[in-house]
Amino acid sequence: MLDTIELSKKLISFDSVTPAKQDIFDFLIKVFEENGFTTKQLNFDGDGSYEVINIMATYGPTNTNGKHFNFLCHVDVVPPGNLEDWDTHPFEPTIKDGYLYGRGSEDMKGCTAASMVSVFKFIKENKDFNGTISFIITGDEEADSINGVKKVVRWLKENNIRIDGSIATESSSEKIIGDQIKVGRKGA
């Protein structure tokens, strides 16, 4: 069984400044498929923006009477800026004084890893689960946010894929937890 900290560290080790590159998605696809998910890579471009890689990983049939619950995540990060300003390298995950440091440790690679590990554990412990769980992971939340979630939602509609509920485990907010609902928000 995967460990949240170890998966977070692996995700942090990918330099995935917006738009996130293929290597982190290849890794995610492998992890999802090893845990019984089917995956679909969704690349979108146009509308005056760059090409963005997105994936949808799905567990369970989509044509049952069960509900379809989704986790909405992103693995792109803002540029780290001047590397000399960092105490540790942004893409070399480091645990110091009980904290995990590295670009994306909070927004949102750590949250993505925690969601994945939790769902994998749920599936393992609930073999009779009658429903569908999916992850939509985009590579463009921290910048334009044009060829990520917006186009994935359009693709879902075009393919008659209905999601009954979704949660973005994004940990950022303006003043209090839950005060922001947006398609994209630049962090750091």
Each model region followed by its residue ranges:
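Acidic/His- and Gly-rich active-site-bordering loop/insert found
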Residues: 1-101, 124-129
